[in-house]
From Swiss-Prot:
This is Histidine--tRNA ligase. It catalyses: tRNA(His) + L-histidine + ATP = L-histidyl-tRNA(His) + AMP + diphosphate + H(+). SUPFAM superfamilies: Class II aaRS ABD-related, Class II aaRS and biotin synthetases. One of its GO terms (biological process) is histidyl-tRNA aminoacylation. HAMAP family: His_tRNA_synth. Homodimer. One of its GO terms (molecular function) is ATP binding. Its main location: cytoplasm. InterPro entries: aa-tRNA-synth_II, aa-tRNA-synth_II/BPL/LPL, Anticodon-bd, Anticodon-bd_dom_sf, His-tRNA-ligase, HisRS-like_core, HisRS/HisZ. GO terms for cellular component: cytoplasm. Its EC number is 6.1.1.21. Gene3D superfamilies: Anticodon-binding domain, Bira Bifunctional Protein, Domain 2. Belongs to the class-II aminoacyl-tRNA synthetase family. It comes from Lactobacillus johnsonii (strain CNCM I-12250 / La1 / NCC 533).
Length: 428
């Protein structure tokens, strides 16, 4: 049997992983500047963590989730999204306590799993960058989250993105809207897909997210939740949009927007990218919203929360098209060549000294001929080559060459310990 990776997974090889590292580093630094701290949760949880949060009728739980019974008979699921595990950790570790500063704001960069049809930017194992903030119901918290999402995409170099927003209102609004959807879809129930017929009795809001052609023909005339928002929900939504306008963040009021998970309340949003080189129509790369009752679902206290998640695979597709500089392979600072007896170990010592000073450095462990060593230095995109020869070593000197223009300089072995000064001389 040929050994190969499972369908829906990819190997991110060293030639590509550097760009992923850059993107994740930008994201980490961005979140830290906003005082969001990293949280790491298990890649698998008890099944109920996701069935409670995402909803039994959601496609994520009913069709896409990897779940199984482990050897102890426990019903386990691989993480299909990031929020539920973070909420579980928030409750289990009593992070709602008075000794924890609120809002409690975290970020994560995790691998996640969904059984979907693999396609460009969508795999069965994928990566998600996300943030969650617990403890504030203020519209400022929503705006903070929206602003962070907007500014992070800008900092990463994403272009042509558009913010779509909608409001799902409060519990009373959802209940009234639920009844309106039932009344609308019930007369045509027999014409709906099997999934939507089931959803009609369990969670008719899910029908609005259907991709089935049998359902889609009824969606344009379906009731809009904006018509059911109460005064409080409308005022909250207006406060948020007013602040977005003051911040210069453009948005589209999207009455058709619903999120694919059941836990959202209040504002929901998606950032969509239009790029004809990638997709025929605008595609979502970031989505999120407010979820004020999810902590209670996990037996925690009433806690408002808001967050977003980015599909990293889709993000990388966009960035490769729109910010190709992130995908330039980075070289190393120094490659150390050597020739002659007694120079091999000195190359090791020189590399160690350079690394201790914060430089990247490599030497040829295979001790090839000097010409081959220089060829390797070129292939690894070294900025400088240091050459150690037996005679030069005996005299306590060595040669450093800048490959971009061929400029060279001789220096003493002691100068190795102050390499930044040497580089400055080369720059003169």
């Amino acid at each position: 049997m040929k050994v190969q990776r499972p369908k829906g997974t990819v190997d991110i090889l060293p030639g590509e992983s550097g760009s992923w590292e850059k993107v994740e580093s930008i994201a980490r630094n961005f979140f830290k500047r906003a005082n969001y701290r990293e949280i790491r949760t298990p890649s698998f949880e008890n099944y109920e963590v996701f069935s409670r949060s995402s909803g039994e009728t959601s496609d994520v739980v009913s069709k896409e989730m990897y779940d199984f019974n482990d050897k102890g008979g426990r019903h386990i699921a691989l993480r299909p999204e990031g929020t539920a595990g973070v909420v579980r950790a928030y409750v289990e570790n009593k992070l709602y306590g008075p000794d924890v500063v609120k809002p409690f704001s975290v970020y994560y960069i995790d691998n996640t799993f969904r059984y979907e049809r693999p396609q460009a930017g969508r795999q069965r194992e994928f990566h998600q960058i996300g943030v969650e903030s617990f403890g504030s119901d203020s519209p400022l918290a929503d705006v903070e989250t929206l602003m962070m999402a907007h500014d992070l995409l800008a900092e990463l170099g994403v272009k042509n993105y558009e913010l779509h927003i909608n409001s799902l209102g409060n519990a009373q609004v959802r209940e009234a809207y639920h009844d309106a959807l039932v009344n609308y879809f019930t007369p045509v129930k027999d014409q709906l897909s099997e999934d939507s017929q089931r959803r009609l009795s369990q969670n008719p809001l899910r029908i609005l997210d259907s991709k089935d052609e049998r359902d889609k023909k009824f969606l344009p005339n379906a009731p809009k939740i904006v018509d059911y928002l109460d005064d409080e929900s409308r005022e909250n939504f207006k406060t948020i949009t007013d602040m977005l306008e003051q911040l210069g963040i453009n948005y589209v009021m999207d009455d058709d927007l619903v999120r694919g998970l059941d836990y959202y309340t209040g504002i929901i949003f998606e950032f969509m990218v239009e790029d004809k080189n990638l997709w025929e129509s605008a595609t979502t790369i970031l989505g999120g919203g407010r979820y004020n009752h999810l902590v209670e679902e996990f037996d925690g206290p009433e806690t408002p929360a808001v967050g977003f998640g980015i599909g990293e695979e889709r993000l990388m597709l966009v960035l490769k098209e729109q910010n190709p500089d992130l995908f330039q392979e980075e070289g190393i600072d120094f490659f150390i060549t050597n020739i002659g007896a007694g120079t091999e170990f000195k190359a090791v010592e020189v590399a160690r000294s350079l690394r201790e000073q914060g430089f990247s450095a490599q030497y040829d462990v295979d001790q090839k001929k000097l010409k081959q060593q220089f060829r390797k230095a070129d292939r690894v995109h070294a900025t400088f080559v240091i050459t150690l020869g037996a005679k030069e070593l005996e005299n306590g000197v060595l040669n450093i060459k800048r490959l971009s223009d061929g400029k060279t300089i001789d220096l003493s072995l002691e100068d190795i310990n102050n390499m930044q000064d040497v580089i400055n001389k080369l720059e003169d």
